[in-house]
């Protein structure tokens, strides 16, 4: 059965206000921007997010007031913005409810969710501010239905009496959204390069949406199963979205759009400029096709990477 849908229909069917969502990719690598823009257009809000090594995707959701609670380790457009500006401003202003874990623990939490574990025991974070301080208090947690009542609990190691380990909760993800290079109509997905948390969140979530650069036939994708990363049984919607990770990069196909990210770094310094940017690049555009038309063919083609090198060569002096 074909799972191919339009982006508008996939978001409308599977993503709802109040959901706990997880986004694939890593800072400026294969982030599902096209899907995030559609979430913004559809007015979906009150989201709980487990961000991992997040980027401008989560920064835009936060800056538009769509995030109710945010569990995170790092949010940045690496190499351009070391700490995403709307994320930082909203947190410093007390407008963002956020919890902080170490990056290694967050990625293990995702894997534990994929395995269906009830909780995750770790030896990490002990003796650090991550256990000394809670970003979300117990009192506030009781008001958040998608956030566990405790950040962690100390438990005894049953195999080593007297040793304490940290038990962290396993996320209950409603929707995972991933951008990949290739997918087939039955939902099988191929990810080139780093996989990051993408396989885990696809397996853990109740629903998974995959936007992709290319849809290849079910027959073709089965010819070399060693290249496949996510089985079709884990995917609910497949969406054709060329350059769906822009302005981040998509390994093997196109580089990140450094001038675009620099503009975003500048405009995200103030809420007024950020809002104007979102109006121009998200809300005034009907869909992803209009976004690509606004970027223009020349700009998009110039981002294509040189085969074997992994980056594009049409770089201005400003970019070098």
From Swiss-Prot:
Pathway where it operates: Amino-acid degradation; L-glutamate degradation via hydroxyglutarate pathway; crotonoyl-CoA from L-glutamate: step 3/5
Q: Which domain of life is it from?
A: Bacteria
The record's keywords, sorted A to Z, are:
Cytoplasm, Transferase
Its top-level enzyme class, in one word, is transferase
Q: What SMART domains does UniProt report for this protein, alphabetically?
A: CoA_trans
Biological process (GO) annotations?
Answer: glutamate catabolic process via 2-hydroxyglutarate
Example GO CC term: the record gives:
cytoplasm
Q: Name one GO molecular function term.
A: glutaconate CoA-transferase activity
Subcellular localization, as worded in the UniProt entry: Cytoplasm
Q: What is its EC number?
A: 2.8.3.12
Reaction equation(s) it catalyzes: trans-glutaconate + acetyl-CoA = (2E)-glutaconyl-CoA + acetate
Q: What family does this belong to? A: Belongs to the 3-oxoacid CoA-transferase subunit A family.
Q: What does this protein do?
A: Catalyzes the transfer of the CoA moiety from acetyl-CoA to (R)-2-hydroxyglutarate and related compounds like glutaconate.
- Complexes and interactors: Heterooctamer of four A and four B subunits.
Specify the protein name.
Glutaconate CoA-transferase subunit A
Q: Which species is listed as the source?
A: Acidaminococcus fermentans (strain ATCC 25085 / DSM 20731 / CCUG 9996 / CIP 106432 / VR4)
């Amino acid at each position: 059965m074909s799972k191919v849908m339009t982006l508008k229909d996939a978001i409308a069917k599977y993503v709802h206000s109040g959901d706990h969502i997880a986004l694939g990719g890593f800072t400026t690598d294969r982030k599902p921007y096209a899907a995030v823009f559609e979430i913004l257009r559809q007015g979906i809000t009150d989201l709980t997010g487990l961000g991992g090594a997040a980027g401008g995707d989560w920064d835009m959701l936060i800056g538009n007031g769509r995030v109710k609670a945010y569990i995170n380790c790092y949010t940045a457009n690496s190499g351009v913005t070391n700490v995403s500006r709307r994320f930082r401003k909203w947190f410093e202003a007390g407008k963002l409810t956020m919890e902080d874990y170490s990056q290694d623990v967050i990625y293990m939490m995702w894997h534990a969710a994929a395995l269906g574990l009830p909780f995750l025991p770790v030896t990490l974070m002990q003796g650090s501010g991550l256990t000394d301080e809670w970003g979300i208090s117990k009192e506030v947690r009781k008001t958040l239905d998608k956030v566990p009542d405790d950040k962690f609990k100390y438990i005894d190691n049953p195999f080593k009496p007297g040793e304490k380990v940290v038990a962290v909760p396993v996320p209950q993800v409603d929707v995972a959204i991933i951008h990949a290079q290739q997918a087939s109509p039955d939902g099988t997905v191929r990810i080139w390069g780093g996989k990051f948390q993408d396989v885990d969140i696809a397996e853990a979530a109740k629903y998974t949406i995959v936007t992709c650069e290319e849809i290849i036939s079910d027959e073709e994708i089965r010819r070399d199963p060693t290249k496949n990363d996510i089985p079709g049984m884990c995917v609910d919607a497949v969406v054709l979205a060329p350059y769906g990770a822009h302005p981040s990069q998509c390994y093997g196909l196109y580089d990140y759009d450094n001038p675009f990210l620099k503009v975003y770094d500048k405009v995200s310094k103030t809420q007024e400029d950020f809002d104007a940017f979102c109006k121009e690049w998200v809300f005034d555009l009907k869909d992803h096709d209009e976004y690509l038309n606004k970027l223009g063919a020349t700009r998009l083609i110039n981002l294509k990477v040189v085969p074997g090198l992994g980056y594009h060569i049409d770089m201005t002096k400003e970019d070098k």
